[in-house]
A protein has these predicted regions:
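Carbohydrate transferase catalytic cores enriched for Leloir-type hexosyltransferases
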Residues: 1-328
Length: 328
């Protein structure tokens, strides 16, 4: 989507290191004098430092997480979830405090709130946002062609078995890894579970045995080949605001098992096996069903993923910018 009348400038906290491997920011990025942990505190306590202190001549500010950047300009914020209201036990004490201060600031200051799912829209209404400030802006998915060279390289790098169940995500309590590990370990005929993701908090390291293997952080450019190679992608999270790995896995032909009753059901759009994330037997049954109907799930998942377009996300976001400036 071309929007020549819009100039985007990124603003980030100070980092010791550059972008992660394989990622180059698509826009120029200006750096604030503080790193992210300090920024979260000073933004939500003192509304400082202002974005305008490092970028001149801006019309509005778009914060891409619930923690709003400090600004005197019209503020648009993307809220992916309000999980801390549903499950405060899944977050650190400090995290809960920062998120609650952030929510109060958004209720007071945000001109527009972009929600990545209808489930998050519902939660924002319940939290006190009036309807005219809310916009549903679903996320898109980026697909990458996987070559034979990619397949061989990734297979060798991670020593991928012929068949495996895959989980992708940060290791944290709401991802429900303990029940997923129990489910796979209880299945005598199940392929091993491979866990790809960064360490988060509060989740004990997976038991490393023949049933479970931890890959650690996997760069984005390696994930498509792993999605493509997996037998089943299992994502039985307890709570998500969207669940981007679900649609990413579908876009690369993986049969998907995910949770019913949360936003991942919405994202899956009828193209996944849905399970009760709190019931290990349900997760087991879901994995078995996905393995037995893999071809059908692949076809439905690929069709569903075609509806998830970043171009649509961009169009809806630009429309929200224009509405915000017209009201300012």
């Amino acid at each position: 989507m071309e929007t020549p009348e819009i100039e985007l400038i990124g603003v980030a906290g100070r980092h010791r290191h550059g972008p992660t491997a394989g990622f180059t920011p698509p826009v120029p990025v200006t750096t604030l004098p503080l790193g992210s942990p300090w920024l979260y505190e000073t933004w939500t306590r003192f509304r400082w430092p202002l974005v305008e202190s490092v970028v001149d001549n801006i019309d509005l500010v778009h914060g891409t997480s619930i923690i709003p950047p400090a600004t005197r300009k019209p503020l648009v914020v993307t809220v992916h979830d309000l999980a801390f209201l549903h499950h405060p036990e899944f977050f650190t004490k400090r995290g809960n405090k920062v998120f609650r201060r952030s929510l109060k600031m958004l209720l007071d200051d945000a001109a527009m709130v972009l929600c990545s799912s209808e489930a998050t829209m519902h939660d924002c209404r319940a939290a006190g946002f009036d309807e005219e400030r809310l916009r549903h802006v679903p996320l898109g998915v980026t697909t990458h062609d996987v070559t034979d060279v990619d397949r061989r390289r990734v297979q060798a790098t991670y020593e991928l078995p012929e068949k495996f169940i895959l989980f992708v995500g940060t290791l944290e309590p709401r991802k429900n890894l303990s029940r997923l590990i129990q489910a796979v370990s209880s299945m005598r005929d199940a392929p091993p579970l491979l866990i790809a993701g960064m360490e988060g908090w509060g989740e004990e390291a997976p038991v490393l045995n023949h049933d479970v293997r931890f890959l650690g952080f996997v760069p984005a450019h390696n994930l498509p080949a792993i999605y493509e190679a997996c037998t089943v992608f299992a994502f039985p999270s307890i709570f998500e605001g969207y669940g981007l790995p679900v649609i990413e896995a579908m876009a690369h032909g993986a049969p998907v098992v995910t949770s019913r009753g949360i936003s991942t059901e919405e994202v899956a759009g009828g193209a996944a096996v849905l399970v009760d994330p709190l019931n290990v037997d349900s997760i087991v049954d879901g994995i078995r069903k996905a393995m037995s109907s893999a071809d059908e799930l692949r076809a439905r998942g690929l069709e569903r993923a075609r509806d998830a377009s970043w171009a649509t996300t961009a169009e809806l976001t630009v429309a929200a910018y224009r509405d915000t400036l017209e009201r300012a």
